[in-house]
Amino acid sequence: QTEVVLEGSKEEASIKQMAENYDPTYKISYEVVDSAAFEDIQNASYDDNGDAIVNGTKYRRLKGEDALFMEFYKWPDTTTYHYYKYQPIKWRVLSVNGNEAFLLADAPLDFQFYNLTGKDVIWETSTIRSWLNGYDGECNVENKDYSNQNFINCAFSGEEQTAIITKEIENEDYWHNKQNNTADKVFLLSREEVQSDKAVSYGFGNDLDVHDEAHRAQATIYAFAMGACVSNNGTFTSS
């Protein structure tokens, strides 16, 4: 996504300052618009996900108080909405089998907890799985319904969703937790898929002690605003 800011606003000054003073390896993506264009975006009718279509373009709005962490992105205040323009997702093609392609988003698109609370969970019962796929509360330990507010419905059109294959995920046991296989359209890579001979076939290195550029990805500006650290940080796997 690209952040959209009003020309001459404090948000423009803030994001320019971040772009100048933050980690030089991270390119902050923003677009400055005039007052007429910004008013159209600001006054649009946003749904429960915070999304709206304005003149054929999809936008997401977010306030600082709705972010999971505020330590990294420099919010001028916590109650003013910021606006993010959706962009086509850039994919890494990990493998192709016939007419099926295994895809990984090239950049972290959002920032979410693996589970909403500190409960001992596995992939099958985590809230991140429900949020990614739009499952109801019966599928996670928090009983939280994600059938309306989720990732898959926001990131993909109905036509695109029909093209995504539901795959059986062979989940590795984690410590003392026995994992069942799951059937999901969207999922996190497993440990085996990022560190093993299989990972090498996907283009990743197999030695975590050696810097591997393929394991590196820069978060989108929206994920940054939600709380993602854009310097050195790790990510969760499904296992």
Per-range role (PLM):
Residues 1-239:
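Collagenous Gly-X-Y triple-helix signature in extracellular proteins
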